[in-house]
Amino acid sequence: MPIRVLIVDDHASFRSLARRLLVDEGFDVVGEASDGRGAVRAASELRPDVVLLDVQLSDSDGFGVAAALAEQPHPPAVVLVSSRARADYGHRVDRSATQGFIAKAELSGAVLRQLLGGERTAS
């Protein structure tokens, strides 16, 4: 059974690119959201296995959204993505309620699977 993914990013172009890439690599993209409120609502309704979550959203930051997702009855795994480097966020990634971080330029199914397998940083 394919891994079910919700993509959350305020840029439609990245959501489209990520969808194509992940579908081509065997993931089931069950939905998209463009902001934090939409992410929490969609995760509750769609119950994805993983949420691919932009760190900088128009209405909130990804760390706060990740914390809200962790409080859901069936919390998904959360992987943060950003156009910035992981080092720009310091230890916030390590202390966050997430599986880890992927730089947007490094996004691939293999990297996502690596993080879901337990590694905190794949790029």
Stretches found by the model and what they are:
Residues A12-G31:
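Two-component/phosphorelay signaling modules centered on CheY-like receiver
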Residues G62, V93-I102:
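As written
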Residues F63-H74:
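Short amphipathic alpha-helix used as the core "switch/output" element in two-component signaling
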